[in-house]
Amino acid sequence: MADPSQLFRQQTELLAALDAPGSVEDIVALAPRVRGCLHELVGSGLDGVAATRLIALYNDRLTVRIIASLARRHRLPPVAWCWLALGSEGRHEQTFVTDQDNGLIFQASSSQEADAVRALFLPFAQEVNQRLADAGFALCSGNIMAGNPAWCLSFDEWREQFIEWVRRPEPDALLNASIFFDLRPLYGAAELGEELRTLLLSMTVATPSFQHLMAANALQAEVPLTFRGELALNDDDEIDLKKFGSRIFVDAGRILALTAGTRSVNTVERLLQAGETIGLPAQEQAGFVAAFSHILRLRLAQQSALADAAATAGSGLKPAMPHDLDRAILRESLKQARRLQQRLKLNYSL
């Protein structure tokens, strides 16, 4: 474990470097240093929830500097606009291995104006996406990025899209909801993003059919435990702790928040705030949060180990790798995931 005073000094120096004047090229060049510092900080004993929040905070700072620098270079239209963080970035739950999920919202008074404004924003958004990729944030394979015309929209266009997803949900709509409904204003006119969230919650609270479909969709992820409560491995003798671990808590937190009208997008805050609203016992809430945090910690530890070995860091964990205590806690954490799914079945009559 690194010396705490050394870590503090590195962190202070890095924050100063991130705040110092410089070109977008200078900012991108800081990315490896940010990543190295984060590996050391996370390895110093932080729990999973605190570690992913710390990673997201540093990534936010780097991203905002890139956006602000490029906004000064481009001829942007004189309208209110905001860069939206989506998915794990929106939730403040990023791990070391992450790609981009983002969008852009702007103000326009008509569809014709929206088309004209979008044409001016797209070159800027596309360069931001590319510079973020240069800094280590991989381009989204599903093209959910602000540089895609489909996700560079006026407020009215976003509103119509959200209404379509909630009122007439299809499989693709449910998939999009798992990314876009975790939106967080990151840079610019935050009130545009907050107003969009207000609209979203007003619809989801009043649409039980959508809540039911979201809950049913979340239950498709099967907790990797045998009937006897032992770890169930895939054909590679691994467990995908993202798809069949942390995602279960993320999906459940989102559903509970959209049902209760909770504004938070962070999973822990959603589980605690929405859980209180719907009457989840405090002990049950604490168990869910502790389990989620432990699974995140294991994912981060696996990514660090694979990065040190110069391998590709994925979400799969070979359960023989953790200490016996970690293995036992993983089993208990997955049992909490199963209990959370049972809670969804009960609440939504599934």
Can you describe what each PLM-predicted range is?
Residues 91-119:
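Catalytic metal-binding acidic patch
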Residues 30-39, 52-65, 73-80, 114-178, ...:
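Conserved catalytic core of two-metal-ion nucleotidyltransferases
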